[in-house]
Amino acid sequence: KGYALEDYYDTDDSKEFTKRYLECEQDSNLHGIEVPALDMMKKIMRSAVETGTPFIFFRDTVNAANPNKHAGMIYASNLCHEIAQNVGFTNLAEEIINEDGTITTKTNTGDMVTCNLNSISLGRISDEELEENIALQIRMLDNVISINQAPVPESRMTSDKYRAIGLGTSGYHHYLVNHDIQWESDEHIEVADKLFENIAYYSIKASMELAKEKGAYPAF
């Protein structure tokens, strides 16, 4: 029909994917089979129990929350789903045959996702140290982008364009033991909610302060 369904997603304001999906569904020139949603869900659940896969990616939700939707679209993620960035294809723009017989190609560079990650060891840090350490880690991760050696030009350009980083955690069970918190208790749920809200807040705050110092990333 002249378009690919994977290039669209639904939001509260726009149902572009649903609209085009229904168009395809009603097109007699497109052949397919009808699968009950419940049967599909049963297969997914059985596979998840037996193998741990597949990993479910809710593209509508991810793209609706994408802070860089003005610059592209998120098509997929890695298995753990902590990397959610715009993806774009590199296309051939021009091919020049030189007099010496060599060929020069020019391309329009797409977005090639890069992964710059770090973790807080929750079992070895106090709540009072959290904000200071996160600020340091955010700065370190940003510096990694600058000094890292990318294997291909597209990944270098994408790193510089978005300056995307990921700050995660390790030692979560250690943290709970240190604070005498029983697993899946009401206290556990409350503490987890507060802890990770603080981590998110301190991370965004540190990123904001860094932007004041160094400027916003080019695709902002």
Predicted regions and their residues:
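Function-dense linear segments that define catalytic or interfacial modules
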Residues: 48-159, 169-179
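Polar, glycine-rich mid-to-C-terminal structural blocks
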Residues: 1-51
